[in-house]
Amino acid sequence: MVMGLGLFLLVFMLGLGLTPPTLAQDNPRYRDFLAKHYDATPQGRNDRYCESTMRRRHLTSPCKDINTFVHGNRHHITAICGDENGSPYGGNLRISTSPFQVTTCKLRGGSPRPPCQYRATRGSRNIVVGCENGLPVHLDESIFRP
């Protein structure tokens, strides 16, 4: 009886531990947010970084006018949607309580057609996100422009 209860508790606790990542993987808006805005360990953070990363992530057809990549720990970004690293910022937005390293890629020239050329701006700042079910799904780039 004790062994059966112990096994049940073990399976239950493992199930709890696996639930959040599974839910995150099942949220297409969260996956899209990560694809567009998350880069844990960037190489370079210069104009060439912007051009290659934007192209690799399919953000250049047509050329996207501006895009910001957030660097660092994914958990800290997700925590903005809760009280651990975020606070309300009007409407459904939340602002981080700690700054993040970011690279903002801004389109040079006026043509929305490839080849896209970008200018990189590196910085550290608090970021504003829109959240859905406790996960970031939108980076509000209108709040902070380079």
Curated annotation (Swiss-Prot):
GO BP, sorted A to Z: actin filament polymerization; angiogenesis; antibacterial humoral response; antimicrobial humoral immune response mediated by antimicrobial peptide; defense response to Gram-positive bacterium; hematopoietic stem cell proliferation; innate immune response; negative regulation of apoptotic process
Sequence motif Nucleolar localization signal, residues: 55-59
Gene Ontology CC, one term: nucleus
Chain residues that bind tRNA: R45, C105, I127
Gene3D superfamilies: Ribonuclease A-like domain
Assigned keywords, A-Z: Angiogenesis, Cytoplasm, Developmental protein, Differentiation, Disulfide bond, DNA-binding, Endonuclease, Hydrolase, Nuclease, Nucleus, Protein synthesis inhibitor, Pyrrolidone carboxylic acid, Secreted, Signal, Stress response
GO molecular function: actin binding; copper ion binding; DNA binding; endonuclease activity; heparin binding; protein homodimerization activity; RNA nuclease activity; signaling receptor binding
Main localization, broad class: secreted
Catalytic residues identified in the record: H37 (proton acceptor), H138 (proton donor)
Listed EC numbers: 3.1.27.-
Superkingdom: Eukaryota
One Pfam family hit: RnaseA
Pyrrolidone carboxylic acid PTM sites in chain numbering: Q25
Activity regulation details: Has weak tRNA ribonuclease activity by itself due to partial autoinhibition by its C-terminus, which folds into a short alpha-helix that partially occludes the substrate-binding site. In absence of stress, the ribonuclease activity is inhibited by RNH1 in the cytoplasm. In response to stress, dissociates from RNH1 in the cytoplasm and associates with cytoplasmic ribosomes with vacant A-sites: ribosomes directly activate the tRNA ribonuclease activity of ANG by refolding the C-terminal alpha-helix. In response to stress, the angiogenic activity of ANG is inhibited by RNH1 in the nucleus.
Compartments, as annotated in UniProt: Secreted; Nucleus; Nucleus, Nucleolus; Cytoplasm, Stress granule
Function: Secreted ribonuclease that can either promote or restrict cell proliferation of target cells, depending on the context. Endocytosed in target cells via its receptor PLXNB2 and translocates to the cytoplasm or nucleus. Under stress conditions, localizes to the cytoplasm and promotes the assembly of stress granules (SGs): specifically cleaves a subset of tRNAs within anticodon loops to produce tRNA-derived stress-induced fragments (tiRNAs), resulting in translation repression and inhibition of cell proliferation. tiRNas also prevent formation of apoptosome, thereby promoting cell survival.
Subunit structure: Homodimer. Interacts with RNH1; inhibiting ANG ribonuclease activity. Interacts with PCNA.
Similarity comment: Belongs to the pancreatic ribonuclease family.
Protein name: Angiogenin
Lineage summary: Eukaryota, Metazoa, Chordata, Craniata, Vertebrata
Name of the gene encoding the protein in the UniProt record: ANG
